[in-house]
From Swiss-Prot:
Changing residue 155 to A: Loss of pericentromeric heterochromatin location. Disrupted DNA binding. Changing residue 180 to L: Loss of pericentromeric heterochromatin location. Disrupted DNA binding. This is DNA-binding protein Ikaros. There is a cross-link at residues 58, 239 (Glycyl lysine isopeptide (Lys-Gly) (interchain with G-Cter in SUMO)). The gene is Ikzf1. It comes from Mus musculus (Mouse).
Length: 517
């Protein structure tokens, strides 16, 4: 078939075709081709290959294909999409397009009834002769070659992308961190790591992921093994089709649950932030100091990101059932709950052994959130302008309510959650609070688990107990809390607070201002 096609080409050019032999001579020159058919190097290569036998053409294309694969192994960054290519190669117009398309269809393309061309080597369908010409280079030649490593490509865009490997150029940069990459799609995938939501959800167990690749790995690693073993899933398959009204209700419930967990997690984040180096800001030289808005915005964004992640993990782990009764609690009954819990604790005999096993983690979480709510109510009551003076009756009752709530919480913690040093610390705290609740006259008598009385150092200003004299000394002003002149004066920046609540808030925030003389 190739011989007949070569004869047809010779008739078009007006010259006779030389005799075809099995082994062509090395000194033979390529067959002359008219100018309208020799527009590109691909057409010249195809016209030259018509002089040989069909078997020789197949051998040459196979060797060129192997060389192309070797070039891809040497440094091509991404695979080329050879299914449907855009008409971005060399363009022909008028009669050149018709003649070129007929020549290409005769060389290596099969014209389909819909007008498209099909490659006779791999069967890929191209929309036009120019696209087929570019595609044929993947089987024969790669004209765009890297002058540094020798890697060859069929398109110029792939070569330019490959050159960035040698130059180290990364034009696409993330505006949230220091990540930079060479491709736009890689940056798009990286930006998903900064998002809070997890759109890709597993329909087998309900876990969510930010990237689809992570979800696919999760399915291959876990669920394929469970299905092969014939084990049922952790929960039934979740239907993807949901009603918009149900989704809106779920979002409202999640918002209420997040507000309850926020009080508990805010203290942990504040402690983590206060442990970092303090930021000193001057009043006079504030404008002269260098300010990088990107760093501060990044820090705030990462802090909120950590908070959102912690809240989502807590809600996913604990579930919504343990938090839903607290959402429905009316505001008027919040002040009665701590009193009821304290009365229940005073009449309950202390148990020497561990708590019973029927107390679950949800009970502990309910009590924990209940206690945090009681603390917030008592703190608001003491911080109000009408009660700015220190009333001994109110403060003692509030402290008693907090101690009773802590004792109630300690007795209801799941025994499986206690181990090692944490168990000893909880037992010590339990002994301290039990001694404080049983005898109000001797409220600061601390007894260890062995029955020995421990010495306690109390801060009269903050109402905090210390079992270590060193920590008490640090707290009182040697290294930074209370000042020597005023107990509510910051020893680091000299800020004066009106009460202990403002002083504690100032220390927790960790932003100190110093006055330059």
């Amino acid at each position: 078939m190739d011989v007949d096609e070569g004869q047809d080409m010779s008739q078009v050019s007006g010259k006779e075709s030389p005799p075809v032999s099995d082994t062509p001579d090395e000194g033979d020159e390529p067959m002359p081709v008219p100018e309208d058919l020799s527009t590109t190097s691909g057409a010249q290569q195809n016209s030259k290959s018509d002089r040989g036998m069909g078997s020789n053409v197949k051998v040459e294309t196979q060797s060129d294909e192997e060389n192309g694969r070797a070039c891809e192994m040497n440094g091509e960054e991404c695979a080329e999409d050879l299914r449907m290519l855009d008409a971005s190669g060399e363009k022909m117009n008028g009669s050149h397009r018709d003649q070129g398309s007929s020549a290409l269809s005769g060389v290596g393309g099969i014209r389909l009834p819909n007008g498209k061309l099909k490659c006779d080597i791999c069967g890929i369908v191209c929309i036009g002769p120019n696209v087929l010409m570019v595609h044929k280079r993947s089987h024969t030649e790669r004209p765009f070659q890297c002058n540094q490593c020798g890697a060859s490509f069929t398109q110029k865009g792939n070569l330019l992308r490959h050159i960035k490997l040698h130059s180290g150029e990364k034009p696409f940069k993330c505006h949230l961190c220091n990540y930079a990459c060479r491709r736009r799609d890689a940056l798009t995938g990286h930006l998903r790591t900064h998002s809070v939501g997890k759109p890709h959800k597993c329909g087998y167990c309900g876990r969510s992921y930010k990237q689809r690749s992570s979800l696919e790995e999760h399915k291959e690693r876990c669920h394929n093994y469970l299905e092969s073993m014939g084990l049922p899933g952790v929960c039934p398959v979740i239907k993807e089709e949901t009603n918009h009204n149900e989704m809106a209700e779920d979002l409202c419930k999640i918002g209420a649950e997040r507000s309850l967990v926020l009080d508990r997690l805010a203290s942990n984040v504040a402690k983590r932030k206060s442990s970092m180096p303090q930021k000193f800001l001057g009043d006079k030289c504030l404008s002269d100091m260098p300010y990088d808005s990107a760093n501060y915005e990044k820090e705030d964004m990462m802090t909120s990101h950590v908070m959102d992640q912690a809240i989502n993990n807590a809600i996913n782990y604990l579930g919504a059932e343990s938090l839903r009764p607290l959402v429905q609690t009316p505001p008027g009954s919040s002040e009665v709950v701590p009193v009821i819990s304290s009365m229940y604790q005073l009449h309950k005999p202390p148990s020497d052994g561990p708590p019973r096993s029927n107390h679950s983690a949800q009970d502990a979480v309910d009590n924990l959130l209940l206690l945090s709510k009681a603390k917030s109510v008592s703190s608001e009551r003491e911080a109000s302008p009408s009660n700015s003076c220190q009333d001994s009756t109110d403060t003692e009752s509030n402290a008693e309510e907090q101690r009773s709530g802590l004792i109630y919480l300690t007795n209801h913690i799941n025994p499986h959650a206690r181990n090692g040093l944490a168990l000893k610390e909880e037992q010590r705290a339990y002994e301290v609070l039990r001694a404080a609740s049983e005898n109000s006259q001797d409220a600061f008598r601390v007894v260890s688990t062995s029955g020995e009385q421990l010495k306690v150092y109390k801060c009269e200003h903050c109402r905090v107990l210390f079992l270590d004299h060193v920590m008490y000394t640090i707290h009182m002003g040697c290294h930074g809390c209370h000042g020597f002149r005023d107990p509510f004066e910051c020893n680091m920046c000299g800020y004066h607070s009106q009460d202990r609540y403002e002083f504690s808030s100032h220390i927790t925030r960790g932003e100190h201002r110093y006055h330059l003389s």
